[in-house]
Amino acid sequence: MHSSPRPPSLSHPRAGQCIFRKVAPKITHRHAESNNPYMKEAYDDAKEHSYISYLDANNLYGQAMVQPLPITNFEWSEERDVNTLIETFADNETNGCIVKCDLEYPAELHDSHNDYPLAPERKLVTQDMLSPYAANLQHQLGINKDVCEKLVPNLQDKEGYVVDIRNLKFYRDHGLIVKKVHAVITFKQSRWMKSYIDFNTEKRKQAKNDFEKDFFKLMSNSCFGKTMENLRNRVDISFVTSNRTWGKNATKNDRMIERKLASPLYDGHIIYNEDLAAIKQKKKDLLLNQPIYAGMCILDLSKLHMYRFHYDVIKKTYQDKAKLLFTDTDSLCYYY
């Protein structure tokens, strides 16, 4: 922020805090075998050539952080026409918006999008969602059957989906249907992180050892991490000792421990031994001053980069000949 030409605003609509919310790792095919001359003795020239390629997006978050990102002038918009929003903001260098909308995933896209569905969302994963294979694996490994929330790429319709307008344009152009727009936040945006990220990227190129490369990579990624920090997860930890006397005979230290344990902010404790424990308390006051709106857009732009490569490069070049085996946040593995 200090190296930016204009620091971002750290105040925005209170309700907007809740509208802002990674690419989910996913295994699509569990088994594939390549067959080509590079396999040496394993190569079978009687069979058709096939390859497995693992492709990594170098500096994925860095490329997103040099894009135009929200900076100030956050306002609720009354505009609800998605075409107008896309025409106004999707390719706008100085103005942007985030949209909360309902999306329909047409059935005719399911086969072609099954390996890398657009618009992943956080969902409560229940037992009825598991395939027979997954359910059997859960039983064999003794995995807890409690309902849990996960980031899930899926082909279902979305309700109340929050998305950057640039991603929404890509989703629409690739067949998803915007059924309804619920809310829109507009803002001024600029490439306010570009000079800092470019500096780190250039220093990383010039690095002469692994420490320097990792250091300047960390300088960029940790900056992104702070934009996504959930300040509500911060806690106070007190290390305490006790003479184990209570009531009227309690010492000042013991009464302090009693107050912490009885406090509505109490959030658990760890006992290390008979004489030492740690008491965890939630923060009494929180100052929500992290630019989470920037973090949300960085995540969306990172997804967009991966989606563009898959759908607009690999799919267009190889069509059905390229099969996506698995993905990670910044990588794709193909069999073709």
Task: Please name every model-derived segment.
Residues 1-336:
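Conserved acidic
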